[in-house]
Amino acid sequence: MKIIVAHPQQQHSYRLATALKKRGELGAYATTVYMKPHNLTSLVAKALPSFWEKKAAGRHCDELDDSDVLQFDEARGLAVLFCHNIPLAHSRYDFIRRSTEDAFAEKISELVVREGADAVIGYDGCSASLFEKVRELSPETVRIVDMSAANALYLRTVYERDEALKPEFAESLKGWNRIWDPIDVARTKRELAAADAFLCGSEFVVNSLEYSEINRKFCEICHYGVDTESFPYRQRRGKEEEEPLTFVYLGQVSEHKGVAWLFEAFAGIEASRASLLCVGDVNLPESITSKLASNIDLRGMVQHDEVSNILLSADVMLFPSLGDGFPLSIMEGFASGLPVVCTENTGAADCIVDGENGFVVPVQDAGALRNRIEWFLSNRTEIPRMAKAARDSVAAYTWDAYYENAADAVEKLVEKVRHERER
């Protein structure tokens, strides 16, 4: 089987390409920006400040040979990165991103025909033109979406409900254009219509696709992995009643992560009982942040090597997201020995056994979240047991396991689509 993995940007596409290479099924990994000796990306990186050089260094995968990687529209891809990272260029970002996706799609569809690929795997939000072109030029090629997030059309319904329930937080929901921009909404609909099958990070992602009448028969779930060596485990001890518990949230402090419900749930808890540490970029107005209690600490962004120490010093992780496909921050919390309380709209809920390594609560329900916070405050002696169970939870979620599971899932999807076409 020959499979092409194509992404004009990055996300976790290196991981899937690696999985298929290990299985001997990778026809090519195609992208725009990638670090190779003497290419445009490496030359530009050397000419720019160290910030850009560090970002460029991340555009390389040691598991792939340079010969596995084909680059198209490299200059356009660099322009997308610049527009995304330079504030003065933000207004041009969406136009350049879309035009790059469309130009990239033309090249990949030609590659699919040239290579006689059995399947092409694109990524949600950037594959509408690719799948349409492949359907036209090589209709026998199976078109698979690797869903890095939940269905944007479903998420919009959740966000619209949240706007009505928490209007003061509504502005921070507007940052992800794929949800709101009519052009991107139309592209999402085209992408779903042109795809044959879906590789999903969680049951929640599958459920979100059912909103758009996608048949779950053509969905396969493959959970991501976690690097446990980067997140060491420390055995917890039961804290005394007079010692405050530390609850931690890891992710962007924005309403799409459900922080309004988090702050409401934590309101009125005395500092002598507990504190809430929020680690991540803050995307809320001062009119909200200035009113938070003193035991809610918005730490902001921290260095990657600091994250592990923060998780080791905490007692419980809270993750009240409105919708996340499979947040790696929860897996990092598990690896560090943190019981997790997350919403049903969080893909990592697949990994939680209530009362063992955490709890799953309804989305947009501050009362349910508060009940679980109070449960931990009243059942401190359970935390060491749950901490060990949390760490044990990630044993099955290594990247090596992902490589095997992802390759298996892709093979199943290809066979399902072929069988359906033969009927």
Where in the sequence are the language-model features?
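Acceptor-binding helix/loop patch of EC 2.4 sugar-transfer enzymes
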Residues: 45, 75-96, 141-186
